[in-house]
Amino acid sequence: MVERKPVFVDWCPGCGDFGILRAEEMAIRELGINPKSVVIVSGIGCSGKIPHFMNLPISGVHTLHGRSIAFATGIKLSNPSLEVIVNVGDGDGLGIGMGHFVHLGRRNIDIAVLVHNNGVYGLTKGQASPTLHRGEKTKSLPKPNIMDAVNPLAVALAAGYTFVARGYAYDVMHLKELIKKAILHKGSALVDILQPCPTYNDINTKEWYDKRVYKLDNVPGWDPVVRKEEEAQKKFEQAIMKSYEWGEKIPIGIFYQNELVPTFEDRLTSNIPNYREYYPAKQQIEINGISTTKIDELIKAKRI
């Protein structure tokens, strides 16, 4: 029996974040990863509380709004031996943080990104997030949303993410398996998680999702894994097409997986051969409290 942390979890009753938290904890435990080598990074929003509520001795970094992927990138590149997992809301990660989201994909850094997708800014009383569809009017909006929705899966595919999946917060066991695969994947991984907000999104509710979601694993012939270069384009196009399926039927599962693309860490090693053995976190930065960096020499070199 695992003893619970004496921390009050203040999410609203029925919040999809409970399922995400549980799936994430189980994924880390079942993979047998030393929790002390796991860093969970979050931004601002209801999802930002994940590191505080995680019932594992992980390292948590609760960062600035929209900057969690930037922080995670610095953590991973300074110490590639760590397992870095990012938790962002759809507003946090796909609004103010969209630039970082896109560039993580093109770099293909070995980081897993979990997007808590509920269509609203739940922490600030339910404004429309980038994933709320045009024409929808949730309870806090005075008028229907007039902007088109961001498609997280399609954006990730176009940006270069090499693992792209979608889960559902109320199907915890299925979500757990997706998170495990995202963590094990070598490269940038996205799990877009459909996460009902019972307080502010009265359209995309548990009842609404329950009769629409279906598993790609149950589709005859569905195979998202790229095993050889000549398959990549076909599997990519297949994933793009499937990512736009929304409405009466909503697919969950793995849309695309390609480990043939070298990670950013691999590419960095081609420029810095000893990077893997002597990465920044292993380097000495001070001697007796004095920095080893000689900035005076740098200033002299740059002085005009």
From Swiss-Prot:
Record-listed Mg(2+) binding positions: D90, N118, V120
One Pfam family named in its UniProt record: PFO_beta_C
Catalytic reaction list: a 2-oxocarboxylate + 2 oxidized [2Fe-2S]-[ferredoxin] + CoA = an acyl-CoA + 2 reduced [2Fe-2S]-[ferredoxin] + CO2 + H(+)
Binding site for thiamine diphosphate: I44, G45, C46, S47, H65, G91, D92, G122, L123
Gene Ontology molecular function terms on file: 2-oxobutyrate synthase activity; 2-oxoglutarate synthase activity; 4 iron, 4 sulfur cluster binding; magnesium ion binding; pyruvate synthase activity; thiamine pyrophosphate binding
Record's cofactor remark: Binds 1 [4Fe-4S] cluster per subunit. Binds 1 thiamine pyrophosphate per subunit.
EC nos: 1.2.7.11
Binding-site positions, [4Fe-4S] cluster: C12, C15, C46, C197
Cofactor(s), by name: [4Fe-4S] cluster; thiamine diphosphate; Mg(2+)
Site (Plays an important role in the binding of CoA): K125
Biological role stated in the UniProt entry: Catalyzes the coenzyme A-dependent oxidative decarboxylation of different 2-oxoacids such as 2-oxoglutarate, pyruvate and 2-oxobutyrate to form their CoA derivatives.
NCBIfam families: Oxoac_fdxbeta_Archa, PorB_KorB
Assembly description: Heterodimer composed of an alpha and a beta subunit.
Name assigned to this protein: 2-oxoacid:ferredoxin oxidoreductase 2, subunit beta
Organism annotation: Sulfurisphaera tokodaii (strain DSM 16993 / JCM 10545 / NBRC 100140 / 7)
Lineage: Archaea, Thermoproteota, Thermoprotei, Sulfolobales, Sulfolobaceae
